[in-house]
Amino acid sequence: MTNSTDGRADGRLRVVVLGSTGSIGTQALQVIADNPDRFEVVGLAAGGAHLDTLLRQRAQTGVTNIAVADEHAAQRVGDIPYHGSDAATRLVEQTEADVVLNALVGALGLRPTLAALKTGARLALANKESLVAGGSLVLRAARPGQIVPVDSEHSALAQCLRGGTPDEVAKLVLTASGGPFRGWSAADLEHVTPEQAGAHPTWSMGPMNTLNSASLVNKGLEVIETHLLFGIPYDRIDVVVHPQSIIHSMVTFIDGSTIAQASPPDMKLPISLALGWPRRVSGAAAACDFHTASSWEFEPLDTDVFPAVELARQAGVAGGCMTAVYNAANEEAAAAFLAGRIGFPAIVGIIADVLHAADQWAVEPATVDDVLDAQRWARERAQRAVSGMASVAIASTAKPGAAGRHASTLERS
């Protein structure tokens, strides 16, 4: 079906929220509830792990147009019109909406992203993995301006780019908090626990995004996303560490001037802007208080200790499905770390190992199946690496650090 962003006759925009029970989804519903004159929820989709939250959302919004991926969870709730692995995609295809917020986690968001673009609805994209994995496939499906980013960094870039024309842009600068391990050495990272990796210093996010931020993989994904969204070459996309997370991104222009977007860390601001784009939502978040003394720090990223960003850049330059390989390898390695099967440095070590062997995937995808094949290959390769490292760890229980040394070997490959 063909949708538009004209909204209802009363001017309200009809919004479908995918990933409604997650961090971004719950905050988006708060923004919508606070602005009933601007937005109306017309569909919800969730995995099914947080049924109490979903039931509460159904009661609060009155929405019965709901998708749940987990079949058993859908049966427990009852009266769920869309259920199963393709539930979110079918919900998008069958719902008249002006905006689809894709806040699903991981590359499983690819088909819903493509479905949303096909309907003509504006895609408020928090699920960066679908763009990273789909790459040119997603870009070909989108009309100009149809994708509006939800990530704070890309929302900031979109705002800053209003200050000049495309040919006036010299470079884009993404900021990174540095995560919970800023300033740590490679040796320090050998002993990181999932609990430590789940404690972000400035942002409140879901567990996978928090872990990806700790490893700096999230920033690597954002570099790829920046290139795809704004068409700027990788060698003109910089990353700088800014621990306070007040400046979210900057654009430097050819005359030497730099425009930055600043606001306290609150995802409701970029969420509200993506929902209402190009109009802002009054009172979406608190503004900076310049009457209170503060200092903003900037420092270079230590790419030796945190090589994930440079690996992402290499995958992006290689092109084709290599960014899908990067993302899929990370998803498998991150899950293994959270399960206690590998050490923290091994996450990026496995990504490096998989990319090193992935030359065959440096071709542009023609179909979704091409992307899925690349991801399947990367997952299987990563799983073999995890199994090998776990075997080394078991065989070397009397030799602490053996698994970590194996991870370092992979990282250098």
Curated annotation (Swiss-Prot):
Keywords: Isoprene biosynthesis, Manganese, Metal-binding, NADP, Oxidoreductase. NADPH binds at T21, G22, S23, I24, G47, N127, E129, G206. Pathway: Isoprenoid biosynthesis; isopentenyl diphosphate biosynthesis via DXP pathway; isopentenyl diphosphate from 1-deoxy-D-xylulose 5-phosphate: step 1/6. Its EC number is 1.1.1.267. Its cofactor is Mg(2+); Mn(2+). 1-deoxy-D-xylulose 5-phosphate binds at K128, S152, E153, S177, H200, S213, N218, K219, E222. Pfam families: DXP_redisom_C, DXP_reductoisom, DXPR_C. It catalyses: 2-C-methyl-D-erythritol 4-phosphate + NADP(+) = 1-deoxy-D-xylulose 5-phosphate + NADPH + H(+). GO terms for biological process: isopentenyl diphosphate biosynthetic process, methylerythritol 4-phosphate pathway involved in terpenoid biosynthetic process; terpenoid biosynthetic process, mevalonate-independent. The keyword rRNA processing does not apply. One of its GO terms (molecular function) is NADPH binding. HAMAP family: DXP_reductoisom (MF_00183). Belongs to the DXR family. This is 1-deoxy-D-xylulose 5-phosphate reductoisomerase.
